[in-house]
């Protein structure tokens, strides 16, 4: 009886330890949703160049309260999930953040969401229109992210983007 009780306690403790040590950050999703096809920045730039899709880049820190608050809203949004198929999705956490100042156009606050054209160039004109004007790339809700994704789609895909892009090269 005591051997059975000891085994049950050990099994229960192991299960409890497994549950409490998991923070939902498996894979490249890092809490933003493993159902989304995330890439590294390097792989994402290659894929965007080959596919012609724009990139959406999330920059966040594991210790950041605002980042932790955005994660479940982002991960649970079916609209973000659906729109993500029209982007190369890149998720950068902690030391993965690029040192290039293009990735912090108005400061190094977090989280930041930036949109890049298919050539890998940050497009600073795509901002959170309904957010704080001092923090243009800071999103606090799934609705704001969806709005940004839709704006990026309009500006970075299709004929409007190609016309503008080719004019810039001339």
Curated annotation (Swiss-Prot):
- Molecular function terms in GO for this entry? protein-disulfide reductase (glutathione) activity; protein-disulfide reductase activity
Organism superkingdom: Eukaryota
Disulfide partners: 64-67
EC top class, as a word: oxidoreductase
Q: Using the record, list the residue span of the signal peptide; answer none if the entry has no such feature.
A: 1-24
Q: Which UniProt keywords apply?
A: Disulfide bond, Endoplasmic reticulum, Glycoprotein, Oxidoreductase, Redox-active center, Signal
The record's section on PROSITE patterns has: ER_TARGET (PS00014), THIOREDOXIN_1 (PS00194), THIOREDOXIN_2 (PS51352)
**Could you mention a single GO BP entry for this protein?**
negative regulation of endoplasmic reticulum stress-induced intrinsic apoptotic signaling pathway
Parts of the chain that traverse the membrane? none
Its predominant location is: endoplasmic reticulum
Q: Fetch the SUPFAM superfamilies from UniProt.
A: Thioredoxin-like (SSF52833)
EC assignment = 1.8.4.2
Can you cite an annotated GO cellular component?
endoplasmic reticulum lumen
Q: Name one Pfam family in it.
A: Thioredoxin_7
Q: Does the keyword Signal apply?
A: yes
Which reactions are catalysed by this chain? [protein]-disulfide + 2 glutathione = [protein]-dithiol + glutathione disulfide
As for subcellular location, the record says: Endoplasmic reticulum lumen
User: Entry's Gene3D superfamilies?
Assistant: Glutaredoxin (3.40.30.10)
Q: Where is the motif (Prevents secretion from ER)?
A: 167-170
Glycosylation is annotated at: 128
What does the function comment of this entry state?
Answer: Protein-disulfide reductase of the endoplasmic reticulum that promotes disulfide bond formation in client proteins through its thiol-disulfide oxidase activity.
What protein name applies here? Thioredoxin domain-containing protein 12
**What species was this sequence derived from?**
Rattus norvegicus
Report which gene this protein is encoded by.
Answer: Txndc12
